[in-house]
Swiss-Prot record:
GO terms for molecular function: structural constituent of ribosome; tRNA binding. GO terms for cellular component: ribonucleoprotein complex; ribosome. Part of the 30S ribosomal subunit. It comes from Alkalilimnicola ehrlichii (strain ATCC BAA-1101 / DSM 17681 / MLHE-1). Pfam families: Ribosomal_S10. This is Small ribosomal subunit protein uS10. It comes from the Bacteria. Involved in the binding of tRNA to the ribosomes.
Length: 103
C-alpha cells in the first residue's frame, strides 16, 4: 500500500470519548509501523433548541437545550497491511462515529 493514505474522521457528543478513541487509533497505527498526522480537532458544532415548557399560555416560559458535536481528523500515511487489519479489529466506544476513507 505504498503512497496511500487513510483519513479517519471521528464524531461524538462527549469530548472525553472521542479523545480516548483517537488515542487508541494513534497507538494502534504507530505500533504497526505507520506514520500518523493528528488528531486534529475540528470546530465544534453547537445546535441549540428552544422549547416552550407551558402547554397553553406563558410564552415567556421556555427551556433551552444545546447539543455539541465534537470532531477529530487523523491521517495515517503509508499504512501497511498490518495497520489496516489492526484498525478493522479495533473496538472503539459506542458513542463514537468513525468514517474511514482511502486516498
Amino acid at each position: 500500500m505504498a503512497n496511500q493514505r487513510i483519513r479517519i474522521r471521528l464524531k461524538a457528543f462527549d469530548h472525553r470519548l472521542i479523545d480516548q478513541s483517537a488515542r487508541e487509533i494513534v497507538e494502534t497505527a504507530k505500533r504497526t509501523g505507520a506514520h500518523v498526522k493528528g488528531p486534529i480537532p475540528l470546530p465544534v458544532k453547537k445546535e441549540k433548541f428552544t422549547i416552550l415548557i407551558s402547554p397553553h399560555v406563558n410564552k415567556d416560559a421556555r427551556d433551552q437545550y444545546e447539543i455539541r458535536t465534537h470532531k477529530r481528523l487523523m491521517d495515517i500515511i503509508d499504512p501497511t497491511d498490518k495497520t489496516v487489519d489492526a484498525l478493522m479489529k479495533l473496538d472503539l466506544a459506542a458513542g463514537v462515529d468513525v468514517q474511514i476513507k482511502l486516498y
